[in-house]
Curated annotation (Swiss-Prot):
Record's subcellular location: Cytoplasm
Catalysed transformations (reactions): tRNA(Gly) + glycine + ATP = glycyl-tRNA(Gly) + AMP + diphosphate
InterPro entries linked: aa-tRNA-synt_IIb, aa-tRNA-synth_II, aa-tRNA-synth_II/BPL/LPL, Anticodon-bd, Anticodon-bd_dom_sf, Gly-tRNA_synthase/POLG2, Gly_tRNA_ligase_bac, GlyRS-like_core
Xref: SUPFAM superfamilies: Class II aaRS ABD-related (SSF52954), Class II aaRS and biotin synthetases (SSF55681)
Record family assignment: Belongs to the class-II aminoacyl-tRNA synthetase family.
EC number(s) reported in the record: 6.1.1.14
Top enzyme class: ligase
Record's GO cellular component terms: cytoplasm
UniProt record, GO biological process: glycyl-tRNA aminoacylation
Short name of one Pfam family: HGTP_anticodon
Protein name: Glycine--tRNA ligase
């Protein structure tokens, strides 16, 4: 993980935020390459969700909304995490995550009976008189230890609200309290009828959104995996009650394919996790998890949210959230199937999956084996000599390609060092302008993954890239 963090900063993917002032815990800035790659991820998601589905449209809701939205959604009253501290290091952990990870480890170790017993107690915790105490007892009785130190000296479990509260207006009083949204989903739900009417949508249909969310995470860390400011890519799919399971399975399959096929993630590093303990709004939930260097963690949640959200907003706003089927005249509040992907977590998963070290021509190299669609730079143009006609042709090729693709021009250092630089940032192709270019108009294409080379006509470079990026 340290190598990945070092590469990310050195090559301009991710910087610590406000670093000259010492930074701020779990806040990061995306650099030139990071912002390009993140945009590629978001564009690929947006195209997959909206362009390829005629019944899904987009929205960009406000970060701050009427605070009653968050009362209706349940966030004001219950958007809490159960936290427990390691007395040895004073580090704080989510109690539920410690238990869930312990159960998964027992399964992997073949200790099914022990895992089942802890799971039964864990699932019953929410219905006990003191859920916090119950979680604490499970941790103590199961001998669960702190992942970092192996210590089992724990504090009691306590609840922490995760919403950022701020004030709107000149006076800091309760009347001006607003919240930075902890999720993007509610901006979709409150616009259900606006979008449906404006877009003339009929159930089933979906609303997609990419946007920032904010959570006062007590447990931070693992680079950009868990931050207080992060970006979500969410889609809420509205269906007729009784059809949600069919829609859920369809989206579950499609979302897994997006990671493995569109983004090119290693299938063997992707895992399904079914939630047996469900959130108050859900009747079914799965996570897509990825094998990070620090463990197997969630990158996307797929949830059947029932009619909870629309019903709550109907109750608190006094406005009907019912849908009238024009064919059957049925009236109902739609059920919702949600796909919720973390853009930053996806970014980190892609970097983790792509990072490789190997030897080429007797020289060690670091390579990011990113899918060409995801790579921040699609091609590098490298003149063998930077002066004279060779440099001029290379510069012209770079200008031509830049009209359609993100391309870098590099004429500094030996050609071998330039290849290594491009390998390290994940550039899939290098176009080398050399002596043969001046004689017959061909250039060398060098492939990142294999270091193999071939020659193509310089006039075909744009066509070559377009084909490889399809």
């Amino acid at each position: 993980m340290n190598k990945l963090v070092s590469l990310a900063k050195r090559r301009g993917f991710i910087f610590p935020s406000s670093e000259i002032y010492g930074g701020l815990s779990s806040c990061f800035d995306y650099g030139p390459l990071g912002s390009e790659m993140k945009k590629n991820i978001k564009d690929l998601w947006w195209n997959a969700m909206t362009r390829r589905h005629q019944n899904i449209v987009g929205i960009d809701a406000s970060i701050m909304m009427n605070p009653t939205v968050w009362e209706a959604s349940g966030h004001v009253a219950s958007f809490n995490d159960p936290m427990i501290d390691d007395k040895t290091t004073k580090r704080r952990y989510r109690a539920d995550h410690l238990i869930e990870n312990h159960i998964e480890k027992l399964h992997r170790d073949g200790k099914e009976a022990e895992a089942a017993a802890i799971k039964v107690a864990y699932e019953a915790a929410g219905g006990t008189e003191d859920p916090n105490r119950t979680l604490y007892n499970i941790i103590i009785e199961a001998g669960i230890k702190a992942p970092d130190t192996g210590s089992a000296d724990w504090t009691e479990v306590r609840q922490f609200n995760l919403m950022f509260q701020c004030n709107m207006g000149a006076v800091a009083d309760s009347a001006g309290v607003v919240y930075l949204r902890p999720e993007t989903a509610q901006g979709i739900f409150v616009n259900f009828h606006n979008v449906r009417e404006a877009s003339r949508m009929k159930v089933p249909f979906g609303i997609a959104q990419i946007g920032k969310a904010f959570r006062n995470e007590i447990v931070k860390g693992n680079f950009i995996f868990r931050m207080v400011e992060f970006e979500q890519m969410e889609m809420q799919y509205f269906v007729k009650p009784g059809t949600q399971l069919e829609a859920f399975e369809a989206w579950r399959e499609e979302r897994f394919r997006w990671y493995s096929e569109t983004l090119g993630m290693s299938k063997e590093k992707l895992h399904w996790y079914k939630h047996d303990k469900l959130a108050h709004y859900a009747d079914l939930a799965y996570d897509i998890k990825f094998e990070f260097p620090f463990g197997i963690e969630e990158i996307e949640g797929i949830h059947s949210r029932t009619d909870f959200d629309l019903s709550q907003h109907q109750k608190y706003s006094g406005k009907s959230m019912e849908y009238i089927d024009q064919t059957t005249n049925e009236r109902y509040i739609p059920y919702v199937v949600e796909t919720s992907s973390g853009c930053d977590r996806t970014f980190l998963a892609l970097l983790s999956d792509a990072y490789q070290e190997d030897v080429v021509d007797g020289e060690p190299r670091v390579m990011l084996k990113l899918a060409p669609k995801v790579a921040p730079v699609k091609a590098a143009v490298l003149p063998l000599m930077k002066k004279g006609e060779m440099g001029e042709k290379a510069a012209q090729l770079c200008r031509d390609l830049s009209e359609s693709f993100m391309v870098q021009y590099d004429d500094a250092a030996s050609i071998g060092k330039r290849y290594r630089r491009q390998d390290e940032i994940g550039t899939p192709f290098c176009f080398t302008v050399d002596h043969d270019t001046l004689e017959n108009g061909t250039i060398t294409v060098r492939y990142r993954d294999t270091a193999a080379q071939e020659r193509i006509n310089m006039s075909k470079a744009a066509e070559f890239l377009a084909t490889k990026l399809m």
